[in-house]
Amino acid sequence: MTHSPIKPEKIAATAAVALEQALVVPALFQREGIDGYKGAANDTINVKVEGVLPFRTYDWRSGQIGGPNPNGGVRKAIEFDDYAEKTVAVSFGGNIYSAVKLTDEQRDFDLGGWAKLMTKQTEAIGRGLEREAVNHLTRQDYSVTLGGAVSGRDLRRTLIRARDVLNKFRIPAEGRVLLVGTDWEVELLSDEKLNLASNVGESEAVSALREASIGRRFGFDIVVSQEVPGDAAFALHRSAFIFATGAPTVPQSVTGGTASHNGVAIRYIQDYDANYLTDRNVVNTYKGFRSVQDQLLGVNETTDQAFVSTYEHFVRGIKLDLAATDDALPLSSGTGSTPESVELAAITGVGAVGA
């Protein structure tokens, strides 16, 4: 009988594909690698964020220098702006793993090969990454929270309102997602005006993300997550959060391999404990998450000149609360307002007056 050993690289590659296809919430985030973090102090790199320049207009036929024109205008010198790029410190940290001991008897009589064990270990890592992604999603400070039980506004109009807010925040239309918990899913599927129930089960799923998708409405790909709180939903762009993974190096003293699939990396290593006649399998990945803040471009209504926001704002995502009877918007004035909320409301037109 021919002995055909399976290369560790193939095992790692299979695990990487399985892991990528098992993800739902992390799959909605923008992905990046870890090469830039290697060797960096405190596992932190400084990322330059491009600056924003305002446009300016010049008075037409404004007369001679220092002298008024017939309309009373004076020819003025043009204004020069300073261009600056901000530096943002981005930290990378975390190691999610699954380690299993496998006796000779288990390997030979119970599992019949490496495939079943690898599937289970990959599922474990997937659950860990899913939990981490949801934690970052739910702990983010959102500038806008829309109520799902606002008087006189059904769910359809709530989704339209979410679209309107992202439009006013100038978020690109392509790549928008509505991530919902299970309570939201029930309400959306039960709403005849949305007609989403007919989409469920239309096509064969090839990944957990596709399986979790229940339709597309008002520019949003609607995705369900059982990890997200049932009464919560998030309207966001896929670039709102960054999801980074990296495969640790395989030590020279053990058998192993690394692989990456669609930006999701993983390492597989194995050794044998002869004292106990036991295999030891370890599957792991480095991970990191962060949100993306933006500087905004506004226009002064008095001078009609553009300006760049003083503060950075998280505008690539908003929250929806199924039970809330009121919207929580940036306060433009009054009690509870902050310089950041006043600026955001002034630039975007999305805001409310405080008490």
Report the location of each language-model feature.
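N-terminal "assembly arms/tails" that initiate or stabilize quaternary assembly
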Residues: 1-90, 325-355
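Long, contiguous amphipathic alpha-helices that act as assembly "spine/axial" helices in icosahedral shell
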Residues: 47, 85-154, 169-179, 222, ...
